[in-house]
Amino acid sequence: DVKGAAGTWLRAYANDGSMSPDAKRSNFGDVGSQDYSLSSSGIEAGFGYSFNSAWTVGVFGGINQGDYKPDVGGKVSLDGNTWGGYVTFTPGNGFYADLSYRDIGFDGDALNNGSKEQLDGDASGFSLEMGYGFKMQSGLEIEPQLQYSAVSVDLDNVAYTSGGFELTDGDAAQLRIGSAFRKTFNQDNGVWVPYGAVSYIQNYD
């Protein structure tokens, strides 16, 4: 059994994607693209402590960067600092549950029609994920997963060359249902574990 074990970890990540909102414009008509692309990257480091083989708690911090670019022009670039904590439950029967919280302070620039405005704000949110993994006779491990996450964004007011405006704070939630797949290969020089996942994601605001 694991009792009183501690450790550190480090991870780097990068994401890139695009969206095509199902929306209409009330003031300019519904012509023209409303599609946009998103990208983000960052690095995080953390410290975890296992009370026993089932319960682990930890804290983490890191830096991140993101870009938002509409097809019709303009761009928003953000830099942020993040911190948070997590609790993980793994009883050893294939089930796991993970609850995490994070807070992000960010600032950046918005480019639009030749002007450059500064943005500043904070975001906080939590994620609850659980799953159950089982192994096939071939050695393939299949792990159905369920995850719910929510975030709240607090944006400071923006002043620009033609006046000023107040930004509405945003709240959003996401439900993810999916399954992970992995298989362990023991080699002379170590262990290789190829991993993949498929998910259905529903966003709420």
Predicted regions located by residue number:
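Membrane translocator/pore-forming domains, dominated by Gram-negative outer-membrane beta-barrels
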Residues: 3-205
